[in-house]
Structures are given as structure tokens and as C-alpha cells.
Amino acid sequence: MKFPRKGIPQEEVMRELEKYTSKDLSFSSGKILGSMCTLPHELAKEVFCMYMDRNLGDPGLHPGTKKIEEEVIEMLSDLLHLERGYGHIVSGGTEANILAVRAFRNLADVENPELILPKSAHFSFIKAGEMLGVKLIWADLNPDYTVDVKDVEAKISENTIGIVGIAGTTGLGVVDDIPALSDLARDYGIPLHVDAAFGGFVIPFAKELGYDLPDFDFKLKGVQSITIDPHKMGMAPIPAGGIVFRHKKYLRAISVLAPYLAGGKIWQATITGTRPGASVLAVWALIKHLGFEGYMEIVDRAMKLSRWFAEEIKKTPGAWLVREPMLNIVSFKTKNLRRVERELKSRGWGISAHRGYIRIVSHASCDGGHD
């Protein structure tokens, strides 16, 4: 397609857009079953659209939005049992994970840095390793798909700059034994990063509801940083990932000076320079509106849906669970996986066939419905 010399009427533009986007699945259809993201809350959509011109990459122009981001980090820190945290709302879990690895690398005086992480870790760490020159050391998994902490310890060396634990793996929603990893990290003086991109907006509320889940956050002294994504179970519009550090030194280690911005002497710690302030404002509005109890209701329904679905799988001949769900992710296998996958997709269902099994993520929408 060539760049058009003359424009066309808006009505025609919208018709062409509809022609393309009609091929997309929408969250409002209720047929997307394999995504960790969901239909944004109505309030979040309203706020996002209202403030689309805000740029947190130039906070001197938008001091009010900058203050809102600080309050969001304060609220996320409180949710994660940290009195004072440091961080940003970023483009997503990928950027958040890269920032954590970058901070660990920059603070470590290591010529050949290595990062130990579970074989269940998100592919964003592969990007981080390639971009930052950090060698990834993959730790084995236990039969229940949690990381083998003994194998993590066996792989620690003088080059280890950090350890990663997962609180809600992409494929199975598994929560690693973060308390054991925290103890290990403290014993060896190595920082621990927890990727809770998905679980961060699930586990605190699920634990309050009585679900037996391990601690994963800053309550554990070895945890130095956490990825938490409001645009997943937080019901915020994309893009809205989050990174929270225990100490300011981690943020300082990845900050660079942008002297030409409004106000001068602006330090940036994020990968992206231009950042949508609308995302931050939407997250702030959602947290203030829903509160802990509102999110607890959302998680309650999502967890109940996943348990119901898991029981239905058990009743289905030729299908079986990969493991009992820990969060609101159910993964199962069938004797004819590819045929089942093709049949579901032909009927318009958006599913995720993940490493030999089908993954279903249950979401409770703001009106009590579900995807």
C-alpha cells in the first residue's frame, strides 16, 4: 500500500477500518478464552479517552499526571505489602521484566552476568537477556510445574546477578515457592525478582478469600522487585504494565538524564521515552473506584469460574487437566488436541494452545459477566 496523496472522507475511512477489524475477535463478544487481558472497565475506558494527550515522558508538562503515577505506585506498593516503593506504569510485563533485569545487572559488578529463572518463565526474559548481555540459566521444574528451588541453588555462581520467581505462569497460572526463593536469595545476597504480571492482581484478593496460595510479595525480605500488570486482571486499558522496586537504588541504576524536556534535569528509568499518561490515569481511577473489595469480588467470580471449568474437564471423556489450577487459569489436554483446537477456533472461540495443551483464562467483567 502506498502513502495516499489525497485524503478520503472520514466515513469511508471508518468503513475501511470496519472491513479489517471485523476479522478481529473482541473481548465484548465473550469468545476470547485464552488471553490474560480482558475487556477494560467502563470507567477506565472513559478516563483513557478523556486524557489521551497526556505524555508522562515529559512530566514537566503534566505535573498532575506525574503525581497520579506516584500515587498509583504507592497504592500498588501497599497492595504488595511495601510501605514505600519505587517504580512506574510501563507498556506491559515485558518492559517491566526487562527493567528489573537491567537494574540487577547495572548494580552488580559482574563481567559475565547470569540470571537464574524457571523454565516456565515468560519469553520476555529471553529478550532481556539478548538486549542486556545477560546469560539466562534455566532452572528445572518440579512435577507440579513449580520451580525446583534446589536446582536454583545448584546453579548459583559468582556471576549470578539475580533470581526470578513466577507468581502466575503464563501457561498454567502456577505460583512458584517464592518464600523459599526469598530465603535463598537472602542467604546468598542475591536480589529476587517476582514476575507477577498476571498474579499480582489475583493473589492478594484470592488469599483474602481463603485460597491457599503462597506469599509472593514484599512481605518476603528477599523480594527486591515485582512486575504487576493492571491491564490484565486489573481491568485497565492496554498499555498498563507495572514495575515496583523495594529500594530507590534500583530505579537510580536504570535512570538516564533527558535534559531538554520541560522543567529540565528530568531522569527517565523506563525503556520508552514517550509514555501514555492516560493509562496511568485510568489505573488510578479504577483502583480508587473498585478498591480492595471490588477487586476481591472480581477475583472471587473468576476463581469460581475456573474451579467449575476444571471440574467439567474432569467429567469429559478424553480430556484431562495438566494440573489443578492455582489461579484462574485452567489448562487441559485431549487425545485429539489439534482437532479440538481447530474445531473451537472454527466456531469463533479465541483459545490458546500452549505447549501441547489448551489454556483457558477465566475473567469476571465489571458487570458480573465473564469472557
Swiss-Prot record:
Keyword Lyase among record annotations: yes
Keywords of the record: Decarboxylase, Lyase, Pyridoxal phosphate
Pathway(s) where this gene product acts: Cofactor biosynthesis; coenzyme A biosynthesis
InterPro entries given in the database record: GrpII_AminoAcid_Decarb (IPR050477), MfnA (IPR020931), PyrdxlP-dep_de-COase (IPR002129), PyrdxlP-dep_Trfase (IPR015424), PyrdxlP-dep_Trfase_major (IPR015421), PyrdxlP-dep_Trfase_small (IPR015422), Pyridoxal-P_BS (IPR021115)
Catalytic activity: L-aspartate + H(+) = beta-alanine + CO2
Cofactor: pyridoxal 5'-phosphate
One of the protein's GO biological processes: carboxylic acid metabolic process
Modified residues (N6-(pyridoxal phosphate)lysine): 232
PROSITE patterns assigned to the protein according to its UniProt record, in alphabetical order: DDC_GAD_HDC_YDC (PS00392)
Listed Pfam families: Pyridoxal_deC (PF00282)
MF (Gene Ontology): aspartate 1-decarboxylase activity; pyridoxal phosphate binding
Domain of life: Archaea
EC number: 4.1.1.11
Function: Catalyzes the decarboxylation of L-aspartate to produce beta-alanine.
PANTHER family linked: PTHR42735, SPHINGOSINE-1-PHOSPHATE LYASE 1
Family: Belongs to the group II decarboxylase family. MfnA subfamily.
Record-given protein name: Probable L-aspartate decarboxylase
Species the sequence originates in: Pyrococcus furiosus (strain ATCC 43587 / DSM 3638 / JCM 8422 / Vc1)
Source species taxonomy: Archaea, Methanobacteriati, Methanobacteriota, Thermococci, Thermococcales
Gene: mfnA
